Amino acid sequence: METRIVFHIDFDYFYAQCEEIRSPELKSKPVCVCVFSDRGGDSGAIATANYTARKYGAKSGIPIVFAKKRLEERKDAVFLPVDFDYYSEMSEKAMKIMEEFSDVFEYVGRDEAYLDVTKRTEGDFHKASHLAQQIKNSIREKTKLSCSIGISPNKLISKIASDFQKPDGLTIVSPEKVEGFLESLKIRDIPGIGKKTEQRFTEMNLETIGDVKRLDVFTLNKEFGRKSGTYIYNAVRGIDDELVKEREPSIQHGKIVTLKKDSKDYEFLLENTLELCKEVHEIIQKKNQMFKSVGISFVQSDLSNKTKSKMLRNPTMSLEELEKTVEQLLREALENQTATIRRLGVKVSELSESQGQRDITSYF
């Protein structure tokens, strides 16, 4: 039986990298891509920061105010609002390239995917290394994006490996090297292990994967419950039988309508917008998906475009939440609106399955 070969491909500092590609003069500067809240000013959080910004402690998830404080000495620091439409376009181009090189392609998110390449590499890790380099070169040539690739016999190890030599890394963990690769890594490096679990291991004087490996499955089940305990027991041994499942990017769902008359009247536009919300909601219900980002778009009478979007706190499939968010976006978009609107669109993105595998942290 052929050794399974799985790639995990992860795009380096994706949103910020996209901004550097669009504006090459940003490459030498600290760049933070921000999700601004609707409270105004610097309220909000950092979505992604480039490596220059990270050197100063500006990183994903921290408040924008903190990031600005940490980058005070860098007068050239740049803080940009997220542009999901642009990032989705870039992602789609890269995903199509990856899919061409795979036996089985599994889309995970805008900036990551799994590829099963067992057949085309004949289970040969040397051939897999060449294939990975081909993918990296093709993506760079066609999109200018860099990515990091982890190669191993399963999804778990490949995901850990892709984070090993960032940015622009390529890490190969063949079956005989799995044990040595994992031994000295922190337990937190295992996907799904959260702060609480790590803290509990610290209280038990266990820090590395090698340390945790000394525990038997009964001890782990007693400490964390059967499901999580079994997962940890297998993970620290590099055991993962989960298959790469065919899943293509469903980056967004949207509907657009040409209005009966050009208008900038709020009530008229709201009526049309709410109708679009119902149509979009029907799509996500049929596909059993949740969304985390909502956007509206205008084509104005002069044929120029205008878009506005908002990231929600949590994924949802609620029509009420969709309508409420769209209503807010419409009000904001119409402030100081001079041109009339010819076409109107509503879309949802940042999609996920509403039922399916939960992250291991759900159980802790």
Swiss-Prot record:
Catalytic activity, as annotated: DNA(n) + a 2'-deoxyribonucleoside 5'-triphosphate = DNA(n+1) + diphosphate
EC number: 2.7.7.7
UniProt GO molecular function: damaged DNA binding; DNA-directed DNA polymerase activity; magnesium ion binding
Keyword Cell inner membrane in record: no
Record site feature (Substrate discrimination), residues: 15
Cofactor, free-text remark: Binds 2 magnesium ions per subunit.
GO cellular component terms listed in the entry, alphabetical order: cytoplasm
Transmembrane helix among keywords: no
The protein's role, per its UniProt record: Poorly processive, error-prone DNA polymerase involved in untargeted mutagenesis. Copies undamaged DNA at stalled replication forks, which arise in vivo from mismatched or misaligned primer ends. These misaligned primers can be extended by PolIV. Exhibits no 3'-5' exonuclease (proofreading) activity. May be involved in translesional synthesis.
Family: Belongs to the DNA polymerase type-Y family.
Name used for this protein in its record: DNA polymerase IV
Gene: dbh
